[in-house]
Amino acid sequence: MIQIKNLKKEYRTNNTSNLVLDNINLEIKQGEIFGIIGHSGAGKSSLLRCLNLLEQPTDGSIFIADENITKKNSKQLREFRKKVAMIFQHFNLLSSRNVFENIALPLEIQGIPKSEIKKRVFELLDLVELPNKANAYPQELSGGQKQKVAIARALALNPLVLLSDEATSALDPTSTKQILALLKILNKELGLTIVLITHEMDVVRKICDRVAIIDKGRIAEMGKTLDVFLNPQAPVTRSFVETSIHTKVPDFIAKKLQDNPYSYDNTYPVVQLTFYGDKGKMPIIAEISRQFNATASIIQANIETIQDQIVGIAICHITGERQGWENALRFLSNQDVNLKVLGYATADNI
């Protein structure tokens, strides 16, 4: 659906230049929700705006539905932009127009007959669950309702792709939940490809099929959302994941961990176990005690939801005779769970 090849974007002013996108390569599949996350200034907004050529790339190419959009002239671009809609953080509704008129605007610009406009607008109002708000003005709506109107307007011309530029950043938690649920419905019912940028990892884990993490203009990491959350590779990815799910060892414990199991007498492993799906049904901690005469004391445990998957994350201190806990680690490494040895600590130091 979307292919980005060797994309670069450079801003030049006088004798200075600022490279904000550096050799971006990625492919977004038709019908998926693809997240792009990064800190402020990482380049994510510039990348999104290149996808509808609001920003002209300095180099590289972008293909959408097998069309090289970077080669289009102004007239061709106007036609192409009907296929790629966009919603924004601050809604961009016209305060002088009511809800009906805001949604109708792109249809009016295309010269659609009034009878067809009326039918289409009310279809969209039903779709975004605002059937009784046609005559309301933006100032009479909540933030979540305004974003729903913006989404309806974006869908007026039946686009193939919806670009979302921090669409939930200005919303309260309840409205954010409603907008994300709506985007998932639109994705499934309309087969709509959605590309969203955000700085909120919670948004990514709730609705994105895959995610790319951008750092300093480059893709630091990319993959399926569940894989990225459970096994982040890049430091910037780990920092984002830690803001969304509780994978980080508490600082007061981390300070006590040793890298070497033989640093002191009676030093035992502190491990992180991650379960998801049916894996969480296995009585692994009980098995450690039963089979190896070792004890797994839970330091911290959390249940998370990532892409509709239940994920359990437990940090445990495994104590006992050295042969026992070494055998327990070998046992865990052969089970269908993610095992990470975080360090070693004495029994009385945790």
Curated annotation (Swiss-Prot):
Membrane topology category: Peripheral membrane protein
Subunit organization: The complex is composed of two ATP-binding proteins (MetN), two transmembrane proteins (MetI) and a solute-binding protein (MetQ).
GO molecular function: ABC-type D-methionine transporter activity; ATP binding; ATP hydrolysis activity
Subcellular location, record wording: Cell inner membrane
EC number of the protein: 7.4.2.11
Keyword Signal in record: no
Residue intervals of the ABC transporter domain: 2-241
Enzyme class at the top of the EC tree: translocase
GO cellular component: plasma membrane
SUPFAM superfamilies listed in its UniProt record: ACT-like (SSF55021), P-loop containing nucleoside triphosphate hydrolases (SSF52540)
Protein name from the UniProt record: Methionine import ATP-binding protein MetN
Entries under InterPro entries matching the protein: AAA+_ATPase (IPR003593), ABC_transporter-like_ATP-bd (IPR003439), ABC_transporter-like_CS (IPR017871), ACT-like_dom_sf (IPR045865), MetN_ABC (IPR041701), MetN_ABC_transporter-like (IPR050086), NIL_domain (IPR018449), P-loop_NTPase (IPR027417)
Pfam family, any one: ABC_tran
Function: Part of the ABC transporter complex MetNIQ involved in methionine import. Responsible for energy coupling to the transport system.
Main location, first listed in the record: membrane
Gene that produces this protein: metN
Ranges annotated as spanning the membrane: none
Keywords: Amino-acid transport, ATP-binding, Cell inner membrane, Cell membrane, Membrane, Nucleotide-binding, Translocase, Transport
Gene3D superfamilies for this protein: 3.30.70.260, P-loop containing nucleotide triphosphate hydrolases (3.40.50.300)
Residues the entry annotates as binding ATP: 38-45
Claim: Cell membrane is one of the keywords in the record: yes
Organism: Francisella tularensis subsp. tularensis (strain SCHU S4 / Schu 4)
